[in-house]
A protein has these predicted regions:
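ATP-dependent carboxylate/acyl-activation modules
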Residues: 1-162
Length: 162
């Protein structure tokens, strides 16, 4: 309850002060613990010829272990996103393999489309996007980004300063 949250906040602030006494902390984010589902990685990088390229694959701790990914230049259509997902070796996990509940593949595809459209629309400003994991919940329950990073292109002024 509230007492546990307050105690956790005090521990976080004390640890931050001990490790980085000059840090400016504007607060902490409290979010519900979400369990279950299948973790994907969804991201973009900028290719000098093709522009933003979208990547999707098995995410979380397995992203670098299995390297099961699909790539497509942005923007990606809904049909294209579904094809990317179905091309993955891990698609069986999303499709209900071995008695697992089917995942909300449509929500995952919509997330891929949204990321690809954002990357294309902001191609002049955004170098990379990394959502890992995108937690794809059971069918009909959606997908949620649990961690995300957007890396901007280096500005000309910062490049000139180097």
């Amino acid at each position: 309850g509230a007492d546990n949250a307050a105690a956790a906040y005090d521990r976080i602030m004390a640890a931050a002060a001990a490790h980085a006494p000059d840090a400016r902390i504007d607060g902490v984010l409290v979010a519900p613990m979400i369990t279950g589902g299948t973790e994907l990685i969804v991201g973009t990088t900028t290719d000098p010829i093709f522009g933003p390229v979208v990547m999707v694959g098995l995410g979380g701790i397995f992203a670098e272990v299995f390297r099961d990914t699909a790539l497509q230049p942005a923007p990606v259509s809904l049909e294209g996103a579904q094809k990317m997902l179905r091309s993955l070796k891990c698609f069986a996990l999303l499709d209900g393999a071995r008695g697992r509940p089917r995942a909300d593949v449509d929500a995952a595809a919509q997330a891929i489309v949204a990321v690809s459209e954002f990357a294309k629309r902001h191609a002049d400003d955004v170098a990379e996007i990394d959502i890992n994991p995108l937690l794809v919940r059971d069918q009909g329950k959606g997908a949620i980004a649990l961690d995300a990073l957007i890396i901007p292109h280096q500005t000309q002024t910062s490049e000139a300063a180097e």
